[in-house]
Curated annotation (Swiss-Prot):
Keywords: Carbohydrate metabolism, Lyase. HAMAP family: MurQ. Its EC number is 4.2.1.126. This is N-acetylmuramic acid 6-phosphate etherase. Pfam families: GKRP_SIS_N (PF22645). Pathway: Amino-sugar metabolism; N-acetylmuramate degradation. The gene is murQ. A lyase-type mechanism (elimination/hydration) is suggested for the cleavage of the lactyl ether bond of MurNAc 6-phosphate, with the formation of an alpha,beta-unsaturated aldehyde intermediate with (E)-stereochemistry, followed by the syn addition of water to give product.
Length: 305
């Protein structure tokens, strides 16, 4: 009997996959990944709805809580972890939960994803509340751990977003903002770390990056909230200030040194001729939106979904 979940079905076009020459094998595997991009493009309206719903939550100080199992859980951990160095997002406001706990990041924890009660407990343990945004990810959309977590988060009043790769998946009915990433059968049957996982990664990148844009973490397309924690990023910070202000390298570095390395504060200092303290205070008063401080336009509000 055929599994009704499309991600578990046998792809009809690749029955001879194990007989392909090396170049054809690589081409087939790479080409099939393009379906992930198409799936995310098709889900753009749903991602926009999730974005518009989540921004007010986060503006009130809410957290991003990611939930998943296996590949989906690891992708959530990755997205949560990268928000701090990229956007200076407070690490305590990005909470990744994975079935089986931290050990599951590096190795499979058999049976962990089947424990619905564990998902409920893990969400309750982080004291999820009405200002939080829970992003639940499961290729099948049927994973008990993820369903338990999503239902628990929703019951606690959190905004819930669900990413699943199967039409009609229970996860999509269990959340406030369902996002269907319809990637279909995998080139290696059932291996959802491939196309389904790629679509999840793109969708998470898209949603979290869009959230950071709307929360004032960028100026234009510049990462002005980047945390310079190594030599490469320190050099990038200086170049960002130069690009945004037209200042020379010495002036950019001096401003960064005065304000503790904040690119956003440095560009406001140089553009408005302010000291570090005054620039920082103005940014705080504008909710971190540099354009508003600079008088270059109001911070964008949410658009219609």
């Amino acid at each position: 009997m055929t599994d009704p979940r499309r991600t578990e079905q046998v792809h009809p076009d690749y029955a001879d996959l194990d007989t392909l020459a090396p170049d054809a094998l690589i081409a087939a595997l790479a080409d099939d990944q393009l379906g992930a991009v198409r799936a995310v493009q098709a889900a753009a309206p749903q991602l926009t709805a999730a974005l518009n719903a989540a921004v007010p939550q986060l503006e009130r100080g809410g957290r991003l809580v990611y939930v998943g199992a296996g590949t989906s859980g690891r992708l959530g951990v990755l997205d949560a972890t990268e928000l701090t160095p990229t956007f200076s997002w407070p690490p305590e406001r990005a909470v990744p939960l994975i079935a089986g706990g931290e050990r599951a990041i590096r190795q499979a924890v058999e049976g962990a994803e089947d424990d619905e009660a564990a998902g409920e407990r893990d969400v309750q343990a982080v004291n999820i509340g009405p200002d939080d945004v829970l992003i639940a990810v499961a290729a099948s959309g049927t994973t008990p751990y993820v369903l338990g977590a999503a239902r628990s988060g929703r019951a606690a009043g959190a905004l819930t977003v669900g990413l699943a790769n199967n039409p009609g998946a229970p996860l999509l009915a269990a959340v406030d903002c369902p996002v269907l990433l319809d990637t279909g059968p995998e080139i290696i049957s059932g291996s959802t770390r491939l196309k389904a996982g790629t679509a999840q990664k793109i969708a998470l990148n898209t949603l979290s990056s869009a959230l950071m844009v709307r929360l004032g973490k960028l100026y234009g397309n510049l990462m002005v909230d980047v945390r310079a924690t190594n030599a490469k990023l320190e050099d990038r910070a200086r170049r960002l200030v130069q690009h945004a202000t037209g200042a020379d390298a010495d002036a950019a570095q001096a401003a960064l040194s005065e304000c503790g390395g904040s690119v956003k504060t440095a560009l406001v200092m140089l553009k408005l001729g302010l000291g570090a303290q005054e620039a920082a205070q103005r940014l705080e008063g504008a909710g971190g939106h540099a354009r508003q401080v600079l008088g270059e336009g109001e911070a964008l509000g949410t658009s219609a979904s």
